[in-house]
Every structure is written in C-alpha cells, then in structure tokens.
C-alpha cells in the first residue's frame, strides 16, 4: 500500500512513453492514466511551441495527446497558476491535473488560501526544478559561450553542477557558477530559490537520486499527500507504471543535491539582499526607490503576477483615487499598494520582473520583503493550506 512520505523509483510500462518521456516517462504515464480513468476532466501541462525556447501552456482532454507534453523545457518561464485562475475559473467547475514546478505549486496553494482556486479539484504532479533559463539570453549564451548554434540544440539540463547543452552530434557542459558569473545561466529569481523539490504538490518527481541499473531509466517519486498516494497506488495496480524501492544511497544523494542547491540559493540571496538582517520591511522598499522611479505604470507587473486577481484593482479606482492619473513615475503608493496586496504570498516566480519594460528588479524586491515577512510572522509561503497569509484579510 502506497502511503504519504513513501519514496520509489518509477517508470512507465508503455514503451513509447518510456522512450519519449524523460527518465522512464512516469510523469507522462500518470497524467495519461488520470484522463483515461476519468479521475480528471483535463490535464494542464506545458509543451514545446515553435522551438525549444518556447513553452506553451496546453489543456489536454484526450489521453493519447498527453505524450505531446513529454520532456522538460528549461526555458519555460511561465507560472501555470495564472492560467488556472484566469482561464479555468480557479478549477471550480472542472477537475484538472497540472504539472508544477515548486513555484507553480506554491502559488496554487497561496491563491487557494485566498479562495480563488479549488484544491479539491486539482491534482498537482510536481517536478523538481533547479532553475529555469531566460529564452533570449539563453540563445545568446549558447552562441557566444558554448559556441553552438541555438537552433541545433535538442536538450539542455543542469546536472552535477553544470549547465549541459546538447545537439544531435555534440554535448558541452560548463559550470553553473561560471556561466552565472558571466551574467548568463538561470533567471535571477531562480538563483535565489531554495525550493527545488515540490513537496507542497501531491507527488514530487525528478531524476535526483536514481542510481544503479535504473539510472536514466526511472523517476524518483516522493509521495507528498493522500491524493498523491491514491493516484500512485491506482496507477501501479492498473499496470500503467512500475515502482521499486529506491537504493538508500540514492535517497542520500537526492538530499545532498537539494541541500547543495539550497546553499547556492542562500549565497545568491546574500549577494542580492540587504545585509542588515534586522532591517525593517519598509526600509527595503525605501532603498529601492531609485529603481522604482523608472516605472512607466504600464501595469505589466500586475497583469503577470499570479497573486493579483482582483476584479476591480485599487490602483485604478476612481473613488477613492489612490493613484493620481497621468503621473509618471507614479507615486510610491503604487508599489506600496501592490506590496500590501501580494507580498506575503510572493513565491519568487519572477513573472513581474520578466515582463517589466523598465527592467526594474521587481522579483528581487518582493522576494526580499517576502523573506522579511516570513521571518517576522513565522509564515511559510506556499505551504500549509490552513495557514492564512499574515497581511491578507479573508
């Protein structure tokens, strides 16, 4: 019997999926099984668009099409939670399975706390994430640093501390630290992220810790909820996937990799954040005013933020008029208002910074303040569905 906190090596019994899906195709097989058994109405996943650097969210209702979403897209920088709230009515009238990076899963949990997603209708199949790559800069990096043609790349991955780029006839790996010191590599928000294994999802899957005969042929699965346990047990009973107990050394290696990534994140936090550990929250906002004064009030940050969902935004209300119309840069109240609305639930997904045309380091600002909020209130963003965000009123 599969139970919460169990760990396994898992691989698909379907040869086509095992070959096309990564590390034995367990993720793809689980998603296909959910649709075939009618446990969900649709699967929300990401598939390759025009090329490797273009990740497109897709809603799949036909089991045979799930395989189109197989494989990783490290240049897929979207936050899938926004799709659920904006286009699927928060899964309030549809049952879905969704593949989630840790920041996706954390955001889904935070938005659910605010009553905008029905978690009873969502199964989160979480995948490990050591960071995503900005598409445009990654193409430039591949050409300038790796001396490869970006259009010839068939795969990219982070393994053993290296960013590895593969074409059909060549492979080259360079230290993650080295490429990031050059200004390339992972997105800046990903560098600071300590959440690599999505234990806030229903299942946490990845290749870390798979050693021995199944190395490269199976996925490491950690069961993180009752829903996840039920799904895995049914899939195994149906003969869709096969599971084996993990090699103890593999469990140890997985934890070491995770801890190494956490240590690297803390190094980047120290590099990016205010060194005054006891600094007041608002002091952090004040010291970024020069950056915030670049704002052209385009509202891209609000539109991109998966935590922003108000039907009537207080930044645009006429009565009272909190923000003076036509003034650029806007009053500091513009950013203070946004901060009060979302910063306690900020998951450092980086959407705001990625879309800002003024190149304001918004993700860094909100992430730093969110860390202060967590320290001050003892809050753990993205976990514990019963714990309300400290700055949010029901």
Swiss-Prot record:
[4Fe-4S] cluster 2 binds at residues 305, 346, 349, 352. Binds 2 [4Fe-4S] clusters. Residues 285-306, 337-367 form the 4Fe-4S ferredoxin-type domain. Transmembrane segments: none annotated. It comes from the Archaea. Keywords: 4Fe-4S, Electron transport, FAD, Flavoprotein, Iron, Iron-sulfur, Metal-binding, Oxidoreductase, Repeat, Transport, Zinc. It catalyses: oxidized coenzyme F420-(gamma-L-Glu)(n) + formate + 2 H(+) = reduced coenzyme F420-(gamma-L-Glu)(n) + CO2. Its cofactor is [4Fe-4S] cluster; FAD; Zn(2+). Its EC number is 1.17.98.3. Dimer of an alpha (FdhA) and a beta (FdhB) subunit. This is F420-dependent formate dehydrogenase subunit beta. The gene is fdhB.
